Curated annotation (Swiss-Prot):
Protein name per Swiss-Prot or TrEMBL: Malate dehydrogenase 1
GO biological process, one term: malate metabolic process
Function, as annotated: Catalyzes the reversible oxidation of malate to oxaloacetate.
Pfam families for the chain: Ldh_1_C, Ldh_1_N
Active site: 188
UniProt KW keywords: NAD, Oxidoreductase, Tricarboxylic acid cycle
Length: 328
């Protein structure tokens, strides 16, 4: 007997990230090759015709697991009974656009979506915010979804995690599966901290394997942190396929478990590592049985403390700005 279908809501569904995301969900990359899915897609009214074209393509793929596709411009329709929600749509970040400009443009969007999730989604829904500024957008959505579990809403920092793993593997001449225990802390912004001090490469400590502290400080950290900007400058648009892949990775591990591996997620802080409670902050986690837990008892040296504190300060500033915008 086949399993009951799971409902997956995706916002910004006619956009570039979603175009790389939806077909993988329908194929089973998110929930597994034996789990039927219903896609519930949200778009702005002016983009519904384009979304209908995407739906035609989904239909033409004849995915065995895709039970049906529903589209709407109303979040209360798109989120109804959703088991999982991937909030991809946001005001896009263009070349040279400041993050502060994004705050005002996105606060109302994620207020509305948080309220809708609170009202109509499955009570055990898992929500991943992809649209930037992801951490603060997730904070807004969570604020307006008080009836959902405290850990129901997360933000994506897996793209930064994947970038860090890839760069470290390339430096050491190994494949990415040789790298483990990578940690990315903080905001999805240039202040985030890709931390390889606890990482292993073929079970050897990464700092010893790399053997070059200056490369870590002067190349690895800034290039991982600014990779998104480099992509915008190169292609004239933000990351799409790699962002979709990271969204699948983060949500899949949260749902199905990370197999003991460390995976970076932006989650609501419970005060771990001196990070203020309630802040949406990237941390190393391990996922199992549909839950995540923060990797405990890591040494935080002076460098890590300074980097983490810088990202905390940025997120607190964003949160305070959004509070003023929304009169909270």
């Amino acid at each position: 007997m086949s399993k009951p279908a799971r409902r997956v809501a995706v916002t910004g569904a006619a956009g570039q990230i979603a175009y790389s995301l939806l077909f993988r969900i329908a194929r089973g990359d998110l929930l597994g090759d034996d789990q039927p899915v219903i896609l519930q897609l949200l778009e702005l009214p002016h983009a519904l015709d384009a979304l209908r074209g995407v739906v035609m393509e989904l239909e033409d793929c004849a995915f065995p697991l895709l039970q049906s596709v529903e589209i709407s411009d109303d979040p209360r329709v798109a989120f109804r009974d959703a088991d999982y929600a991937m909030l991809v749509g946001s005001r896009p970040r263009g070349k040279g656009m400041e993050r502060r400009d994004l705050l005002a443009a996105n606060a109302a969007i994620f207020r509305s979506q948080g309220e809708a999730l609170n009202e109509v989604a499955n009570r055990q829904v898992k929500v991943l915010v992809v649209g930037n500024p992801a951490n603060t957008n997730a904070w807004v959505a969570r604020h307006y979804a008080p009836d959902l579990p405290a850990d129901a809403i997360t933000a994506m920092i897996r793209l930064d995690h994947n970038r860090a793993v890839s760069k470290l593997a390339a430096r050491c001449g190994v494949t990415v599966d040789a790298v483990s225990r990578m940690a990315v802390w903080g905001n999805h912004s240039p202040t985030m901290f890709p931390d390889y001090r606890h990482a292993l490469i073929d079970q050897q400590p990464a700092p010893m394997r790399v053997g070059d502290e200056r490369w870590y400080l002067d190349t690895f950290i800034p290039e991982v942190a600014r990779r998104g900007t480099a992509i915008i400058e190169a292609r004239g648009a933000s990351s799409a396929a790699s962002a979709a892949n990271a969204a699948i990775d983060q949500m899949r591990d949260w749902i199905r478990g990370s197999g003991g591996r460390w995976v970076s997620m932006s989650i609501v802080s419970g005060g771990e590592y001196g990070i203020p409670r309630g802040l949406m902050f990237g941390m190393p986690t391990i996922c199992s049985e549909g839950r995540y837990r923060v990797v405990p008892d890591l040494e935080i040296d002076a460098l890590a403390r300074a980097r983490i504190d810088a990202s905390v300060a940025e997120l607190v500033d964003e949160m305070q700005a959004v509070r003023a915008i929304l009169a909270l």
